[in-house]
Structure formats: structure tokens, C-alpha cells
């Protein structure tokens, strides 16, 4: 993009720096790995090792060359395949977009070819994924790599009919099973799945750090109790915090291999991502978002932009605003059905250009090719989440840009990123853009705005201490957000039950109601005035 910040969204490049280290041997109860390989990935992610030189089976090689169209392994594939093929357990640390999925699928397939063939109905390889979208993507890649093998892959996750999944697993082979933790436990409890994993050969935890961040530790422990101890276990993770180290100590056999494709001197973020931070009044956020995207579209014809928001309602509001502006966008978040989410993800993945409004269902692991810009609007849930979102761009050795847009009350978060190569990017709202956006905001469904208000209240309620807000100040700012920023015709109602769950009972300024008006977002009941700016949303369902 280049240049100084301006109304077209251009910026000057920052300097790079930052580091992150690993100390697995010091984790409580953890044994040091017998094999510790550091292979820092620089620039292009492709290694000099051809797949043909790795001793893979003929059906696997045929799938790699004819279906996947690969010739050479990426660095993480090159470094992890040898120890995995030797039968070692592996903990691999690698950046997003580095080819981790193929890195664990290929040797898992090869492991299936060793020893007696699996009995009909057996699950020989179990892969845990933190999100439905990532599980679907892994399943598709597994099917491609299994094209010329007599093995079958299936996927199960929440949001779909569990009876249909059960029937599909009962009526078809399930050599490879990709699953989200919650739905897998459902099948253990209701589908008599335990006997089918009794001879499990390989367990994979993909995006292990996110599995733990999302609170799946109890589920993982329960899953481990169902499967045999004599198995090969593979942990792939973008970061290796203490939680992951503890899982490694519990799940991996002594003498496991630790493969670090990031290294001590490298930042947790991809060095090919140019990063910017803009702190601007909340009133200006929506206008700046439109301004940034419009400018990027003008400068990059084959643009692909992902905008991340704290939750589903914030995502919905932004998407409806862009529709009101006559700017088509892809919308993906937990309030949409799984069918819609899958279709939207596929459309954006296959598109030559486009803009996606997303909650964190797209933040990890999902491979959207050629994303040129990632914009994060509002407070990320953690430093790790900032990094994972940023990882949607600059994949497979390509370059990309990322911008974090914060309000002054969110600026404390920048301290968590001080070791990353982020440059300040002051920005001003173009008056013409502000006028057009305000008019469009007036056409957004008022119910969408009301839901965004409640979500905003819930989200920032969890960060009051960090922002130095009392509960009274929180409510005052939420009300100003609804009336002055979103332009709601009156103070939105909020259910008494919701207020109680937020711990806001007795706080003055809330419009308590026993029930909310019917109908949902997506219509055009009008917004009662343009308002200015934009906010986050509650930490609702993902």
C-alpha cells in the first residue's frame, strides 16, 4: 500500500523485531524431548526437499502430485515427517499458513499402511480441531490425500444433526475421524464410539493452543480417557504456552520430538505481515473501516480482506452496514447456520477478490488463499488471538498487511504487543465518507443495533478493570454507544435475566424489560438516525 496514512488507507512500512521462546522442559511434570529440532522458516515456506525423496507410498505420492499439485515440502512438513514416520510422538511449533495440516495427515496415512489393516469400523486416526470450519477444512484435505487409498475420512462437529452423523459412521468406514471436542464426547456417550477407537494408531491435536484457550482442557482429558495409551500422538500449535506444555507432558510419550519452525529470534507473527495500529475515537471506527477497505480495494484489484470483530453481533452489524452501502460482503459468525457458514467460507476461499466480515470462527487454521489485508476492529480477546487472526494473511510465503483499530479505552491492549513489529498509523475520517456512512447506518435494521448494544455491554463488562471503568461508567458508555454512535431511536431494552448474568443488577441507566420485541436482524425497519462510529460485541457464541 505504501505512503503515509490517509483517507485511502495507505501506510508506510514499519521495522521488524520481537521474539518468543519455549521452555517445555521446565513445565510442571514435563520431560524434556529427546529430539529438539529448530528449523526457522524464513521467507518462502517451501523447503528444498521434494516429496519424492521422502519415501512415501505410491498412492500417497500420486495424491500429492495429481490431486494436491505439490512437488516440494514446506519447512514444517520437511522437519516433522521424518520423526513422525519413525513412530515418535511430536510437538511441533509452526506459524499459521505453513502447511501444518498436510504435515500431520501425510505421516498418519503412512502409519495406517504399517501392520495389519484396520478392522471394519475402526477409527485408526483421530484428529481434534477447535472449530467446525477448521474441522471441515482438515476433512477435505484428508479426502484429497486419501484419493488413491482404500481408507475413508469422516468429520463430526456441533451444529449438525448428530443422528445423521451416527448413521453415516455406522454405515461407512471411518478410518480417519476429524472432530471438535464437544461433539466427539457426545458420540462417545451416545453412539458407542469407544470400542471403535480401541485400536487407535494416531491422535492429532491441531491448533493445540487454541483448543486450550477455548476451554477444551476438560474435554481433552475426557477424550484421552477413552482412547488407548499405546498410540502415536502429534501436537501442532502456533504457540507453546504452559498449558500446551502440560498437555504435552500428559499426552506424549517420553522421548518425543520437539520441532520448532519459529525459533528463538523470530516473532510469533509472520514477518511477511506489515502491521499497523490505529487508536481513534469510537465514533470514528465505522467510518475508518469503510475508508480503509475502499482505499485498499482501489489500490489492490485482486484484494481479499478479512475484518474481525469481537463477536457475532458486531460482525452482523458491520455486514448489514456494508450491504446498506451497496458493498457486497461475506458474513460468517456463530449466529449463522452451519450450512451458511460453510457456503460462505467456500465462496470467499474460491473468490478472486472480496471482503469477509467474521467473528473468531475464521481466526485459526482456516486457509483462505491470497488474503491481502486483515483488519481487527475492537479489542482482541488476547495477544494470541491477535496473532492468530493476523495469520490469515501472508500465507504460503506471500506478503500481507494487518491493521488493529482500537478506541482510546482499548489502548491498554497495545502493551501486550510491544515486542511485535507494529507501527502507529494515525488516521482521520474523510467528511464525505462520514456523511455516506451515517446515511447507510440509518438504514440498518434497528433490531441489529439493539442486539449490538447488548453484546457491546456484555463484551466490555469483562474488561472493566483493565479499562478503569466502574459498572456505572460501563452502562453510561454503552448507552451513549447505542444512542449517539448507532443512532438507536431510544435506549434498547435488555432482559432482566441477561442483566443478572452480567452481574449488573442494580446498576442505574439500564432499560430493563421482561421480553424483547420479536423479529431479528436482516430486515429494514430503519435505524432512527445515522449515528457515528462502531463498537465491538459481546463474547457471544462462536
For the regions a protein language model found, what residue spans apply to each?
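Intrinsically disordered, low-complexity accessory regions that flank the conserved helicase/ATPase core
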Residues: 1-50, 522-542
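SF2 DExD/H RNA helicase N-terminal ATP-binding lobe
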Residues: 3, 11, 38-303, 310-313, ...
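Non-catalytic terminal extensions of ATP-dependent helicases
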Residues: 4-8, 432, 439-542
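Conserved helicase ATPase core of P-loop NTP-dependent helicases/translocases
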Residues: 164-168, 315-321, 326-363
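Conserved Walker B
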Residues: 181-182, 208-211, 312-315, 361-362, ...
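Conserved AAA+ ATPase "SRH/arginine-finger" region at the nucleotide-binding site
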Residues: 238, 258-265, 277-283, 377-380, ...
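A short beta-strand element within the Helicase C-terminal
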Residues: 364-378, 401-404
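Conserved segment of the helicase C-terminal RecA-like domain
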Residues: 388-432
Amino acid at each position: 500500500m505504501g505512503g503515509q496514512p490517509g483517507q485511502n488507507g495507505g501506510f508506510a512500512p514499519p521495522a521488524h523485531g520481537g521474539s518468543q521462546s519455549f521452555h517445555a522442559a521446565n513445565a510442571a511434570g514435563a520431560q524434556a524431548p529427546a529430539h529438539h529440532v529448530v528449523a526457522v522458516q524464513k521467507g518462502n515456506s517451501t523447503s528444498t526437499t521434494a516429496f519424492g525423496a521422502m519415501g512415501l507410498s505410491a498412492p500417497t505420492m500420486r495424491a500429492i502430485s495429481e490431486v494436491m499439485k505439490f512437488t516440494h515440502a514446506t519447512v514444517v512438513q520437511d522437519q516433522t515427517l521424518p520423526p513422525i514416520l519413525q513412530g515418535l510422538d511430536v510437538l511441533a511449533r509452526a506459524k499459521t499458513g505453513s502447511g501444518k495440516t498436510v504435515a500431520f495427515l501425510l505421516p498418519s496415512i503412512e502409519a495406517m499402511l504399517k501392520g495389519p489393516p484396520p478392522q471394519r469400523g475402526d477409527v485408526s486416526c483421530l484428529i481434534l480441531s477447535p472449530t467446525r470450519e477448521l474441522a471441515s477444512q482438515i476433512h477435505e484435505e484428508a479426502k484429497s490425500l486419501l484419493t488413491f487409498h482404500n481408507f475413508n475420512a469422516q468429520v463430526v462437529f456441533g451444529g449438525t444433526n448428530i443422528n445423521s452423523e451416527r448413521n453415516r459412521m455406522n454405515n461407512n468406514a471411518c478410518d480417519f475421524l476429524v472432530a471438535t471436542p464437544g461433539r466427539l464426547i457426545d458420540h462417545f456417550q451416545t453412539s458407542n464410539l469407544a470400542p471403535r477407537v480401541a485400536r487407535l494408531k494416531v491422535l492429532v491435536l491441531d491448533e493445540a493452543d487454541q483448543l486450550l484457550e477455548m476451554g477444551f482442557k476438560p474435554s481433552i482429558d475426557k477424550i484421552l480417557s477413552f482412547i488407548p495409551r499405546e498410540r502415536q500422538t502429534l501436537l501442532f500449535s502456533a504457540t507453546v504456552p504452559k498449558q500446551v506444555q502440560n498437555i504435552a507432558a500428559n499426552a506424549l510419550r517420553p522421548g518425543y520430538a520437539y520441532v520448532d519452525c519459529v525459533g528463538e529470534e523470530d516473532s510469533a507473527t509472520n514477518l511477511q505481515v506489515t502491521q499497523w495500529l490505529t487508536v481513534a475515537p469510537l465514533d470514528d471506527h465505522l467510518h475508518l473501516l469503510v475508508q480503509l477497505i475502499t482505499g485498499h480495494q482501489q489500490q489492490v484489484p485482486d484484494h481479499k480482506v478479512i475484518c474481525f470483530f469481537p463477536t457475532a453481533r458486531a460482525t452482523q452489524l458491520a455486514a448489514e452496514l456494508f450491504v446498506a452501502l451497496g458493498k457486497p460482503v461475506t458474513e460468517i459468525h456463530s449466529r449463522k447456520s452451519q450450512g451458511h457458514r460453510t457456503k460462505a467460507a467456500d465462496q470467499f476461499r474460491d473468490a478472486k477478490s472480496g471482503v469477509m466480515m467474521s467473528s473468531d470462527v475464521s481466526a485459526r487454521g482456516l486457509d483462505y488463499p491470497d488474503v491481502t489485508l486483515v483488519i481487527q476492529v475492537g479489542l482482541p480477546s488476547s495477544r494470541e488471538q491477535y496473532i492468530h487472526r493476523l495469520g490469515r494473511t501472508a500465507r504460503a510465503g506471500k506478503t500481507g498487511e494487518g491493521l488493529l483499530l482500537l478506541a482510546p479505552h482499548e489502548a491498554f491492549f497495545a502493551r501486550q504487543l510491544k515486542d511485535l513489529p507494529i507501527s502507529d498509523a494515525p488516521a482521520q475520517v474523510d467528511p464525505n465518507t462520514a456523511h455516506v456512512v451515517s446515511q447507510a447506518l440509518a438504514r440498518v435494521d434497528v433490531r441489529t443495533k439493539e442486539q449490538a448494544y447488548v453484546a457491546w455491554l456484555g463484551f466490555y463488562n469483562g474488561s472493566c478493570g483493565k479499562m478503569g471503568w466502574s459498572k456505572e461508567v460501563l452502562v453510561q458508555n454503552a448507552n451513549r454507544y447505542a444512542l449517539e454512535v448507532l443512532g438507536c431511536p431510544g435506549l434498547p431494552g435488555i432482559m432482566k435475566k441477561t442483566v443478572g448474568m452480567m452481574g449488573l443488577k442494580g446498576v442505574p441507566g439500564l432499560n430493563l424489560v421482561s421480553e424483547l420485541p420479536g423479529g431479528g436482524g436482516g430486515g429494514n425497519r430503519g435505524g432512527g438516525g445515522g449515528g457515528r462510529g462502531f463498537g465491538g460485541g459481546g463474547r457471544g457464541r462462536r
